[in-house]
Amino acid sequence: MTNKRKSAKPLEPAKRTPKLRTKKSRDLSASESSCDFVKVTRAGLHSRNKHQGRYDFAKLTQALPSLAPFVIKNPKGEASISFSDSTAVKMLNKALLSAHYQVANWDIPAGYLCPPIPGRADYIHRLAELLEGEVKGTFPHEKVQALDIGVGANAIYPIIAICDYRWRYTGSDVDPKSIESAQRIADSNPVLQGQLELKLQDQSQHIFQGIIGPTDYFHVTTCNPPFHASAQEAAFGTQRKLDNLAANRLKKGVTAKAGSQKISKNKPILNFGGQNSELWCQGGESSFLKRMANESERFAHQVLWFSTLVSKKDNVRPLRKQLEKLGVRSIRVVEMSQGQKVSRFVAWSFMDKLQRGEWIKLRG
């Protein structure tokens, strides 16, 4: 069974979703409001993450023999690849998906984001943990309906969630080429068939509107938002990462000159590549998050938990304050650290614990 690409249609004008708050709560300060706020910090990869420790290149090259020419020795004599080589990084991803997720047919068009899989997997596992906290006993993951905003050409979040938890996913994107690429991946891998539906968001000013229909319900949404405010800013950010990577290689005794690889603002290269819609939007990440929060209110009763990665730590507090103004009943900030790298996601629900329990009983 394969999925047809669907072009999103504008929703009919709908009545404003009633806020799940009382008049009294609107008069309370943020610290006194009825919003349940919890921040947690998780060190290291989730115990269910398949990518613990160093990559097993013997296993990976067995799964994908074409990775072998890209395997090198680092100064410690350990097997690795050059992470500044876009082809090597893509081959590593292909091998990881084949070896650990039974996704043997995966590819992305040139210039599109090639995501680091271990960190992406942790986002999914922490969200699964959030859902499991809603029930006593075993959570019915096979009944989960999830929505990925900005699925990209790589479809990485649906792949991980479908293969590890059998969630059913809807992926949306404003870029037709990304939708086409994700559809090819879904159609060419039996493990994904019938589990992933792709929708083109043809209203770029909207996030959920035009994607969530009147009869749609989702247990969770995921998103890796664009975090730059312009193409030029995105290009500078990419170059900075390349320079840092080259400097790190020099420190480890590998000959490479920082800044020796330059990019143009229109053509980011290497594993830090990406199309405009993947990298930047007007106003940057903070503006995108505010739009997402505001638009989520309209679908307060149709989504159990909204969530998004937040790249810049300084954007967490404004997002929290905005959500509290909207009458959100529960907010979770989950910080995930792997070595020196720290990432985080914010999840929110317009329902309290009791209401979420009833929602799950109705929809599984």
From Swiss-Prot:
> Is Cytoplasm found in the keyword set?
yes
Q: Where in the cell is it found?
A: Cytoplasm
Q: Name one GO biological process term.
A: rRNA base methylation
A GO CC annotation given for this chain: cytoplasm
Q: Where is this region: Disordered?
A: 1-28
Q: What is its EC number?
A: 2.1.1.181
- Single GO term (MF): 23S rRNA (adenine(1618)-N(6))-methyltransferase activity
Catalytic activity, per the record?
adenosine(1618) in 23S rRNA + S-adenosyl-L-methionine = N(6)-methyladenosine(1618) in 23S rRNA + S-adenosyl-L-homocysteine + H(+)
Q: Which InterPro entries does this UniProt record tie to the protein? A: METTL16/RlmF (IPR010286), rRNA_lsu_MeTfrase_F (IPR016909), SAM-dependent_MTases_sf (IPR029063)
In terms of superkingdom, the source organism counts as Bacteria
Enzyme class comes to transferase
Q: Which UniProt keywords apply?
A: Cytoplasm, Methyltransferase, rRNA processing, S-adenosyl-L-methionine, Transferase
The keyword Zinc is annotated on this UniProt entry: no
- Main function: Specifically methylates the adenine in position 1618 of 23S rRNA.
> Which family does the entry's similarity section mention?
Belongs to the methyltransferase superfamily. METTL16/RlmF family.
Please report the name of this protein according to its UniProt entry. Ribosomal RNA large subunit methyltransferase F
